[in-house]
């Protein structure tokens, strides 16, 4: 196993522990708490994949971080922070909408790279909007936290989420996953549109109804894909 992979996991475990202690003091905001919860799932998945104990990794990560801080001057820290581009966290959904449990009458699921696409194919003839919480850097989607499909009544009928055991995805990965989700929902004559935030950062152009400009041939292909593979 690559030593960098192990040490990276150890540092991530310790930094998560620090953030958890901060949250336990009731000082974290909603985006902070949301990232904390999702990173916990990711660490568990990575630990299982690597065969490493999280508690042991956390202790090792603490030693690595302490060694770095001991060698780091305040001036070097300021320069490092200034040189790193800042990402923004954008929220279409409330914390309640993100954490709400939902159930499917006709569950369908597809794994596309490091993203999991789920939907209820019992939903028909509904107006549906896609909402997402994600980070943005350089005016492009950086990391998807969670995307969900809502009916006008507020029911959740679809979802795209990163797989904890396979971290890392691009904005193109997210765009393709959204296309698959839209194709699957439209197969049952639902009308799907995306939020203004997703329009701005996931696509550079969209139709008047808030849809990405998928041609009819691509829409049919996506619908067949979700029907046959999900």
From Swiss-Prot:
Q: Where is this region: RNA-binding and homodimerization?
A: 1-73
Q: Please give the organism.
A: Influenza A virus (strain A/Shearwater/Australia/1972 H6N5)
Q: How does it assemble?
A: Homodimer. Interacts with host TRIM25 (via coiled coil); this interaction specifically inhibits TRIM25 multimerization and TRIM25-mediated RIGI CARD ubiquitination. Interacts with human EIF2AK2/PKR, CPSF4, IVNS1ABP and PABPN1.
Please report the name of this protein according to its UniProt entry.
Answer: Non-structural protein 1
Q: Give the location of motif Nuclear localization signal in residue numbers.
A: 34-38
| Domain-level remarks | The dsRNA-binding region is required for suppression of RNA silencing.
Q: What does this protein do?
A: Inhibits post-transcriptional processing of cellular pre-mRNA, by binding and inhibiting two cellular proteins that are required for the 3'-end processing of cellular pre-mRNAs: the 30 kDa cleavage and polyadenylation specificity factor/CPSF4 and the poly(A)-binding protein 2/PABPN1. In turn, unprocessed 3' end pre-mRNAs accumulate in the host nucleus and are no longer exported to the cytoplasm. Cellular protein synthesis is thereby shut off very early after virus infection.
- Stretches the record annotates as CPSF4-binding: 180-215
Q: Name one Pfam family in it.
A: Flu_NS1
What Gene3D superfamilies does the record tag this protein with? Influenza virus non-structural protein, effector domain, S15/NS1, RNA-binding
Q: Identify the GO cellular component terms for this protein.
A: host cell cytoplasm; host cell nucleus
Record's HAMAP family? INFV_NS1
Identify its protein family: Belongs to the influenza A viruses NS1 family.
Q: Which residue ranges does the record annotate as region Disordered? A: 205-230
Query: Localized where?
Result: Host nucleus; Host cytoplasm
- The highest taxon in the source lineage is Viruses
- Is the Heme keyword given for this protein? no
An example Gene Ontology biological process: symbiont-mediated suppression of host PKR/eIFalpha signaling
> What's the main place this protein lives?
host cell
SUPFAM superfamilies to which the protein is assigned, alphabetical? Ns1 effector domain-like (SSF143021), S15/NS1 RNA-binding domain (SSF47060)
Keyword terms of this UniProt record: Eukaryotic host gene expression shutoff by virus, Host cytoplasm, Host gene expression shutoff by virus, Host mRNA suppression by virus, Host nucleus, Host-virus interaction, Inhibition of host innate immune response by virus, Inhibition of host interferon signaling pathway by virus, Inhibition of host PKR by virus, Inhibition of host pre-mRNA processing by virus, Inhibition of host RIG-I by virus, Inhibition of host RLR pathway by virus, Interferon antiviral system evasion, RNA-binding, Ubl conjugation, Viral immunoevasion
Using the UniProt annotation, give all residue ranges assigned to the region (PABPN1-binding). 223-230
Q: Does the keyword Hydrolase apply?
A: no
Query: Any idea which GO molecular function terms this record carries?
Result: protein serine/threonine kinase inhibitor activity; RNA binding
Which InterPro entries does this chain map to? NS1, NS1A, NS1A_effect_dom-like_sf, uS15_NS1_RNA-bd_sf
Modification after translation, per record: Upon interferon induction, ISGylated via host HERC5; this results in the impairment of NS1 interaction with RNA targets due to its inability to form homodimers and to interact with host EIF2AK2/PKR.
